[in-house]
């Protein structure tokens, strides 16, 4: 069954050594799948320069509800 998760991601800018926090909404079957989905999204966004960061860290995955 699919579930809705909030995934908090910390973005790091290596040039200014600052960080910021974003929250992504993800539909997945479990926490591991949610983590994998966000990791793939972040890698692609960094590669295509869509994300305003040099690196990231997934810091929290929060289950919201079953769909």
Walk through the language-model features, giving the residues of each.
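A short, structured loop/turn motif at beta-sheet edges
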Residues: 1-2, 28-34
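Short aromatic-glycine-(Arg/Gly/Cys) micro-motifs in beta-strand/loop hairpins
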Residues: 1-19
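Short beta-strand element of the conserved SAM-dependent methyltransferase core
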Residues: 5-11, 26, 55, 60-64
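Sparse, context-dependent recognition of short Cys/His-centered cofactor- or disulfide-binding micro-motifs
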Residues: 11-13, 27, 41-46
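Compositionally biased, intrinsically disordered low-complexity regions
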Residues: 13-15, 32, 52, 67
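A short, exposed loop/beta-hairpin motif centered on an aromatic-Gly-Thr core
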Residues: 18-31
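Short, mixed-charge low-complexity intrinsically disordered segments
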Residues: 40-67
